[in-house]
Regions:
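A ligand-binding cleft/hinge motif common to bilobed small-molecule-binding domains
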Residues: 91-101, 146-149, 172, 177-207
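Extended ligand-binding regions for polar small-molecule ligands
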Residues: 53-62, 128, 134, 141, ...
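Flexible hinge/capping segments at coil-to-helix
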Residues: 118-135
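Ligand-binding cleft/hinge of the Venus flytrap
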Residues: 42, 56-65, 143-161, 190-195, ...
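Periplasmic-binding protein-like
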Residues: 34, 111-118, 187, 191-227, ...
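Bacterial N-terminal signal peptides that target proteins for export
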Residues: 1-9
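Sec/Tat signal peptide C-region and signal peptidase I cleavage site
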Residues: 18-24
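Extracytoplasmic small-molecule ligand-binding "clamshell" domains
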Residues: 25-92, 236
Length: 249
């Protein structure tokens, strides 16, 4: 009788441990628009890679859950979160008061702002020096808005491109005098393509932006897991290693 009871108790305990482990390892569906290197993009094998991807993988490992990344177009990414098709969205999403009304955000995981990229030999040292110069920007971005504020919305000196790398390539070939773009994209491009040829200018007039990981409004349990993992990877140096891998400093 005692042996049977012991066996039953052991089996129940093992089952309880298995269930607890299974709950801790729950897999969440993650929406990301894989068209914004170095944060998220697809490699030659069509795998989703990038800074955001590595950060969330590390957060998941510390937070006790798993993630599955799904390439999700930007125009529908927040709807997929709200209707339950995605549990998490990480896609270089700036935390704004408007977005906080319809979704919840983790603590910030990335500080972003605009940077000016110029050739090393350029005499440009601040935003004001760009008056009368040709500025390359990616269409419809914050960099585009900054150039419009400086030169005027219809200025012929604003040269628009489909992507930031194309704008920087035009800078390298001498077609524009400077590029205004997101700091993460600019730093990554220079680290991989423009070392010793380009430099950046951090103008005080550019406001800081903060990226956050989004979850459905009211999902406090998941948000707590994410914030727990984020705090852990910042504390143990994992975040810094990932940051250095993608941004070089």
């Amino acid at each position: 009788m005692r042996k049977s009871f012991t066996f039953l108790a052991t089996a129940l305990l093992a089952g309880l441990m298995f269930n607890t482990s299974a709950q801790a390892a729950k897999t969440y569906q993650v929406g990301t628009d894989a068209a914004y290197a170095p944060f998220e993009s697809q490699n030659e094998k069509k795998e989703i890679v990038g800074f955001d991807i590595e950060v969330l993988k590390a957060i998941a490992a510390k937070g006790g859950f798993q993630v599955k990344f799904i390439n999700t177009p930007w125009e529908g990414i927040f709807a997929s979160l709200n209707n339950g098709d995605r549990d998490i969205v990480i896609s270089a999403v700036t935390i704004t008061p408007e977005r906080k009304q319809t979704m919840d955000f983790s603590e910030p995981y990335f500080e972003a702002k605009q940077l000016i990229a110029v050739n090393n030999s350029s005499k440009i040292n601040k935003l004001a020096d760009l008056k009368g110069k040709k500025i390359g920007v990616q269409t419809g971005t914050t960099g585009d808005e900054a150039a419009q504020k400086l030169l005027g919305k219809t200025s012929p000196n604003i040269k628009r491109f489909e992507s930031t790398p194309l704008a920087i390539q035009e800078l390298q070939s001498g077609g524009v005098d400077a590029v205004i773009a997101d700091n993460g994209v600019v730093v990554n491009f220079i680290a991989n393509n423009g070392k010793g040829k380009l430099r950046t200018i951090d103008d005080a007039s550019f406001a800081k932006e903060y990226y956050g990981i989004a979850v459905k409004k009211g999902n406090k349990a998941l948000l707590e897991q994410i914030n727990k993992g984020l705090a852990a990877i910042k504390a143990d140096g994992t975040y810094d290693k990932i940051y250095k891998q993608y941004f070089g400093k």
